[in-house]
Every structure is written in C-alpha cells, then in structure tokens.
C-alpha cells in the first residue's frame, strides 16, 4: 500500500475549473482532475475544522453527539489503526488547530508528523509591544499580523512549505512500501493571504481598506468589497 491523502481546508468545488468554474484559475487542480475520479454527489457530514477531521479518522458522523474538539480516548483512529497494522503513516500540515488546546490529539495518531507554522492566528513569531492593525473590513488578528511579516512573497507561504515537505517525503521514500502520506494545507481557509503575484491575476475595482478575512455573519459589505474578497480567495486557489 502506498497512498496519499490530500486535504484542503475550506475548499469549495464550485470555485474549481474542473467543476465548471469560469472566474478562477486553477491549473493544478485541473491537472489533478485529469488523473482522478471526480465525484459530483459526495457530501460531507461535518464541515468545521476538527469535527470533519474526527469523521475522517473514525468513519462516524461527529455532529450527532459532539461539537468542535479532539479525538476522544474511546475513538478508533484510521491512521492509528494503520500504524498498528504495520503501515507507516505521516502527516504534513500547517493547520495550526492540530497543535492547540481543544483540537490536539489528531496528529499524534501518526508515526510521524511535520507542522508548518504561521497560519491564521498561530502563536508562532514573537513580538513584544503593541501591534497596530491596518484599517480593514471583516476580521483581523494581531498575531496573524505579526506572522504575515515572515510569510510574504513566493517561497515563504506555509502552503508552499507543506508541499515542499511532501516532495521531500516522496523523494526519500519512493522505494518504500506500506505507507500513508497525509498532506493537509490550511489554505484556502481565511484569511485569504496570497502573494501579490497571484492577487494581481484577479483584478477588481475595489480601492477600500483591506478585506481578506470575512466575518461569520450575514453579508452586509458593499458589492465591490465582496468581489474583492472573493478574488483574494481565488488567488489562494491559484
């Protein structure tokens, strides 16, 4: 057995070219689709971060009896069962909720794991003193603002680092058998923070304050802001 599980957080199939989207540029997803079986009637049970992961590990619906949380001591975890059966399991992710209180105990089910830092409000880089947030619509986070200074530009994004580590794993273990590689980038989860080179592929008429982190609420922002925020999401997909 040699298997790769590729999981993107907050990925909407309606925004992918293989599923008929006309406003995004997703060439890598198109290449993947050419070598894949595409499902058009496959539905998730739980959609939030950790409930969805618990369903993935256990094969049971999470939303019926609990909310956002860790793997429970009584849960049977798929990667752990594989590990006990002699299949080497490895997780590569920048999904920072894996290593925070309340969301932990998933990554420890694998033989080994690599955590890429810097996404969302990950308490990664230290900054002693006040952090000034720029004018913005929607949400903003001071720790995220600190982190952004270290992940700007090509080659520095956590998403790129995750796939770099995946290539490293495959190169190191290309001749091995009996392994599961779980690759899980947090993108395109908000905030929609992509390099300028990709943002520039999506032009709009928005000239307001920063808007790349929409609130979990009814949409009340001006149409131009909505289009701009959607374009930031598209830049991450590209």
What is the predicted role of each segment?
Residues 1-238:
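Catalytic domains that recognize anionic headgroups
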